[in-house]
């Protein structure tokens, strides 16, 4: 399922414009850009941004089509996580204002109902944990059963790192898609997390795929990684070949080690969106957390016209998102149909 090669190709030389190469290689040939080629895209001057976004949109339309998948997420267990992901206000190791809390099953079902009413076809149950214990898995199982009895929607989960037995349990529950983000390039990961390894995350994703669930894996841009590491990350995702890549942009949270980092410039964020589309021409590329503070309304529109073909509507885990109505109105204005439930199965 690899869409891009990490090795240099004959087309990465400086004698030909990278967008001309991408038009031939990606748009016409369906082969994602390599790591070195993605780096060339990320280094394009700002006056090439409109051309880059237009090409990324063409690639998305050709290889993914016009439909946009809409997803809602809910936090089943918030805060108190033992891991030290430096961007995350849910870590119990930092002095952030987020406190540990659990959601009950009726509230979970109501959230799923509201998500389905928005036109979403995917509802993701998230927990702030290193990995699920028996109590949490039992709660997830009960929640999935209760949702299925009342709501027609695909159910995804994001519960941290899994054992082989837990992967099988989730598959048997009928989980449609499992999210576990690599977060950043392998070479930069130790700057972001020290309580577990990038390889441990990769192992979970491999087991999820082997069990027949869809793989959702992306990360957060703007955590201090270099452009070279951002290109490395795109190539690593292409090697993994996930069904979906959520792109988050760092929204610095008070009390976390990354709380004082600056927000990524909008032009840099849009170049990154387009570059990831050119590396992953057939993959669902989802706007996720941080887009509001990074891009605003105009930037969100440019992103959807620059390679994005999926969105999270409503709020995120610990930060506010755009109202679902705003995103749905934008998609309607752009004449982009929502992906139906049957098409997402």
UniProtKB/Swiss-Prot annotation:
A GO molecular function for this record?
Answer: 2 iron, 2 sulfur cluster binding
**GO annotation, biological process:** biotin biosynthetic process
Q: Which catalytic reaction applies to this protein?
A: (4R,5S)-dethiobiotin + (sulfur carrier)-SH + 2 reduced [2Fe-2S]-[ferredoxin] + 2 S-adenosyl-L-methionine = (sulfur carrier)-H + biotin + 2 5'-deoxyadenosine + 2 L-methionine + 2 oxidized [2Fe-2S]-[ferredoxin]
Positions with a binding annotation for [2Fe-2S] cluster: 124, 157, 216, 286
> Keyword Cell inner membrane on this protein?
no
Report the leader peptide range.
none
Q: To which pathway does this protein belong?
A: Cofactor biosynthesis; biotin biosynthesis; biotin from 7,8-diaminononanoate: step 2/2
The similarity annotation says: Belongs to the radical SAM superfamily. Biotin synthase family.
Name of the protein described by the UniProt record = Biotin synthase
Q: Which organism is it from?
A: Mycobacterium avium (strain 104)
């Amino acid at each position: 399922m690899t869409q891009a090669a990490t090795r240099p190709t004959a087309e990465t030389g400086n004698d030909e414009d990278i967008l001309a190469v991408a038009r031939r290689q990606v748009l016409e040939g369906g082969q994602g850009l390599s790591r070195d080629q993605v780096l060339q895209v990320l280094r394009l001057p700002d006056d090439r941004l409109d051309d880059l976004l237009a090409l990324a949109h063409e690639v998305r339309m050709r290889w993914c089509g016009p439909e946009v998948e809409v997803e809602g997420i809910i936090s089943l267990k918030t805060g108190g996580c033992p891991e030290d992901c430096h961007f995350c206000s849910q870590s119990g190791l930092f002095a952030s204002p987020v406190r540990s809390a659990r959601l009950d099953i009726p509230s979970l079902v109501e959230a799923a109902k509201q998500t389905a009413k928005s036109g979403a076809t995917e509802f993701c149950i998230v927990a702030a944990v290193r990995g699920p214990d028996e109590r949490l898995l039992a709660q997830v199982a009960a929640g999935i059963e209760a949702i299925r009895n009342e709501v027609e929607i695909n159910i995804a989960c994001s519960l941290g790192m899994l054992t082989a037995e837990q992967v099988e349990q989730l598959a048997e529950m009928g989980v449609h898609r499992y999210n576990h983000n690599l977060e950043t390039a392998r070479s930069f990961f130790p700057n972001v997390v020290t309580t577990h390894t990038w390889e441990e995350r990769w192992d979970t994703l491999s087991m999820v795929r082997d069990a027949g669930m869809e793989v959702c894996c992306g990360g957060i841009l703007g955590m201090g990684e270099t452009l070279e590491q951002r290109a490395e990350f795109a190539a690593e995702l292409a090697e993994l070949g996930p069904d979906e890549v959520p792109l988050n942009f760092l929204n610095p949270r008070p009390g976390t080690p990354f709380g004082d980092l600056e927000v990524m410039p909008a032009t840099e964020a849009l170049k990154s969106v387009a570059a990831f589309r050119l590396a992953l021409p057939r993959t669902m590329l989802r706007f996720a957390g941080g887009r509001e503070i990074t891009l605003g309304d105009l930037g969100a529109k440019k992103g959807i016209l620059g390679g994005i073909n999926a969105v999270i509507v409503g709020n995120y885990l610990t930060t506010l998102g755009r109202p679902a109505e705003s995103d749905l109105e934008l998609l309607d204005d752009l004449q982009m149909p929502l992906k139906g439930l049957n098409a997402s199965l």
